[in-house]
A protein has these predicted regions:
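Hydrophobic alpha-helical segments, especially transmembrane helices
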Residues: 3-4, 52, 682
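Residue-level detector of secondary-structure boundary/capping sites
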Residues: 3, 136, 179-182, 224, ...
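Beta-propeller folds
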Residues: 16-392, 397-401, 409-410, 420, ...
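Serine-hydrolase catalytic core recognition
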Residues: 203, 265, 401-709
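Bacterial Sec-dependent N-terminal signal peptides
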Residues: 1-23, 708-709
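Disordered, low-complexity tails and leader-like regions
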Residues: 1-3, 60, 489
């Protein structure tokens, strides 16, 4: 009996390992078993020191000690409004919450468990913005802007019969941090809104194949160097029920960005960026007259300027505000005065401030999120506004996101790191203590998946380059492994992050395990969160430094004894598709296989706002556009390349894929392509599983010994 027990003990680890499940590579991204369990609808209750989240199907409310002090009966709420799924709950006032459905805003008092009032909306209402002080919703429909109240669901704020006049929507194709087009004033007495005239913007035809015959849908698309939209800012007075406009001369079609209200509702601040994007002015305007008051801040840079964050006013000094700028090379904070137009630098970090979270009750300290010394991480800091002293509040390595309480006493710290799943702590800023509220279990513990490692390489000038590699769980350094290099490499993205699994797609973890692959990713110069000098090397020539750094990564791979240098493949999407194509053609023979999704092929076909920032116009920079023209290099193709594109992509237009196809014909080269007829720039829904299958199948079929076809 003892011998049997001993034998079982010896075999137990093997049995446990054998019990681990494999995950289908193409389904890994969408397998809920692999998702980390989170605290859903986590938020502070305004004006209190209590917070809430979904627990056991209901909303639970907690005090700072972590004790449950109340909640919302979701079954009762759902019954009241005939809800078919868990609603997103937003607290607005005391015990009142807002429940949003496709055609209503409901205000519900959870203490007495009954509805207070409701606002009906048309089915086509979009861009909806609720204001509790006015018990009203501003929304857009058919390019026009309306106001809905209990009594009146469709009061016109800005309505035009001209379909080229669009009100209440984000402008400038969501560049400059613009995510919305409706801005309630602090007390709810006014609504500011963006309006754009796209009359002179070129039409681009997209085809809907779901009709018989197929029908044409034109979109407005301002290609680099062509006519741009003309924007302006409107102001609606709720009491007078009248709309007026700021007096901005915008005949030069410059960009209107980062709109903000002053606390007294008398001024609006607006960052106005030249079309050339090498200069901007932060101007204040009088709300009543629409006249410009003064310029509060100016910034110029021969490469580009890119304001992305609106002014944030101090709670105790309504004339002062925080402005974020990278004029010194890194995104830092500046304290500005809206009356005197004076400013001073508040922080001088040699790292990137990513977000202003809020202030303490006295307005003496501002809380921020930023990379800190390691750009792969994100930490929370407090900055004393008068003294400039800085205190780092989070200490665990990894990525921290914070939800600050209204009084600035506490924040909910949402954290993960490479080997640490999602967890939430309550941080008491005053006491400098942290209490763990929730730790998610490792959702991958029972599955056979690859493991992620973080790496540091050096560019040709000594600049650190951060990378990551996924290896099979049974990695054997004596074996030879094929490699998939996954790239993005462009502005406003970072792929190598010290958060759970290195922010790696689950299908790549499954690929490493199931197919005995290595998956390698490197953030080259040009990617974000490293400061302006690191990012701006791409100016006027997007591919040069990106390719240099990616080839540094390739040389590193080739130096590893366990890498099969004859079986390197590369994959990227959007800018990553451009970089994938550039590397495949301009470094022929390096990769046997390439997969380029939603790829930019010719930058003169790309949108003006983004393209002109980094490349100037085709007229100003003909050499740069020619050097970065992917079709120019297709004659060098060795191996196999697959292009994937959404047929109704409104961002990287289908014209790019057609251009590379024609170039292949002209050069007598064979490329592979796949269109998703009903998808836009990113393939979504059930078809994304098909996308992963397409990628993996092409990779496995073609990433063999290099050929010279």
């Amino acid at each position: 009996m003892r011998r049997i027990t001993l034998l079982m003990a010896l075999c137990l680890p093997l049995l446990c390992f054998a019990q681990k499940e494999r995950v289908a590579t193409d389904k890994a991204n969408y397998d809920p078993k692999l998702w980390t369990k989170r605290l859903y609808n986590l938020q502070w209750i305004p004006g209190t020191e209590t917070y809430m989240y979904y627990k056991d199907g209901n909303i639970a409310i907690f005090d700072p000690k972590g004790e449950e002090v109340g909640g919302i009966n979701i079954a009762k709420l759902s019954q009241t409004y005939e809800l078919k799924s868990y609603p997103d709950i937003v607290y607005v006032d005391g015990s009142q919450v807002v429940v949003e459905t496709p055609d209503h805003f409901y205000i519900y008092d959870y203490l007495i468990e009954r509805p207070m009032f409701e606002i009906a909306l048309p089915e086509k209402a979009e861009n909806r913005a609720y204001n509790h002080a006015q018990r009203a919703v501003a929304y857009t429909m058919d390019n026009n802007l309306f106001l809905a109240t209990e009594a009146e669901p469709r009061f016109p704020i800005a309505v035009s019969k001209n379909e080229n006049i669009i009100s209440g929507q984000a402008i400038h194709r969501n560049e400059f941090g613009i995510q919305e087009g409706i801005f309630w004033s602090p007390k709810g007495n006014y609504i500011a809104f963006y309006e754009k005239d796209v009359t002179h913007v070129g039409d681009y035809p997209l085809v809907d194949i779901n009709t018989t015959p197929a029908t044409l849908k034109n979109i407005k698309y301002p290609m680099a160097g062509t006519h741009n939209e003309i924007a302006r800012v409107g102001v609606f007075d709720l009491k007078e029920r009248k709309t007026s406009y700021l007096r901005i001369d915008n005949r030069d079609a410059h960009y209107l960005t980062n709109l903000a209200w002053s606390p007294d509702e008398n001024q609006l601040l607006l960052a106005e960026v030249k079309r050339s994007q090498d200069h901007y002015d932060l101007n204040s305007y009088d709300r009543a007259s629409g006249q410009k008051i003064q310029t509060l801040w100016q910034e110029s840079n021969p490469k580009w300027v890119e304001p992305e964050n609106a002014a944030i006013f101090l709670p105790n000094k309504p004339q002062e505000f925080i402005w974020m700028s990278e004029k010194d090379g890194f995104m830092n904070l500046y304290l500005c005065d809206a009356s005197s137009a004076k400013s001073r630098q508040l922080t001088s970090f040699k790292w990137v401030v990513q977000e202003v979270l809020g202030f303490d009750a006295k307005g003496e300290n501002v809380f921020i999120g930023g990379t800190g010394e390691d750009p792969r991480e994100r930490h929370i800091y407090s900055v004393n506004i008068r003294k400039g002293t800085v205190k780092k509040l989070t200490t665990k390595e990894g990525a921290h996101d914070a939800y600050l309480s209204d009084n600035g006493r506490y924040f909910l710290d949402v954290h993960s790191a490479l080997n640490t799943p999602y967890n939430v702590s309550l941080f008491d800023i005053q006491a400098n203590t942290s209490k763990t509220l929730y730790e998610a279990e490792n959702p991958l513990a029972n599955y056979q998946l690859g493991k992620v490692e973080l790496l540091t390489l050096k560019a040709d000038d000594g600049t650190p380059l951060y990378a990551k590699m996924v290896k099979p769980s049974d990695f054997d350094p004596e074996k030879k492994y094929p490699v998939l290099v996954y790239v993005y490499g462009g502005p406003h993205d970072q792929l190598v992050i010290n958060q759970w699994n290195g922010a790696t797609y689950p299908w790549m973890l499954a690929l490493a395990e199931n197919e005995q692959y290595l998956v390698f990713t490197l953030d080259n110069r040009g990617s974000e969160n490293r400061g302006f000098a690191f990012e701006s090397v791409i100016h006027r020539n997007l591919a040069t430094y990106a390719m240099k750094d990616q080839m540094t990564g390739v040389e590193y791979l080739k130096s590893l004894p366990y890498v099969d240098s004859n079986r390197l493949a590369i994959y990227g999407w959007s800018f990553g598709g451009f970089l994938t194509s550039s590397l495949m053609y301009r470094h022929p023979g390096t990769f046997t296989t390439a997969i380029a999704g939603g790829a930019v092929i010719d930058w003169k076909y790309y949108e003006a706002m983004y393209g002109e920032r980094y490349m100037d116009t085709p007229e100003e920079n003909p050499e740069g556009y020619q050097d970065n023209l992917v079709t120019r290099y297709i004659k060098n193709l060795q191996g196999n390349i697959l292009y994937i594109h959404g047929y109704i992509d409104p961002i990287v237009l289908p014209q790019h894929m057609l251009a590379i196809s024609q170039a292949a014909i002209d050069e007598g080269k064979v490329i592979h392509s796949f269109l998703y007829p009903n998808q836009e720039h990113n393939v979504r829904g059930a078809e994304s599983i098909h996308l992963t299958k397409i990628i993996v199948d092409f990779l496995l079929k073609n990433n063999k010994a290099a050929t010279n076809d």
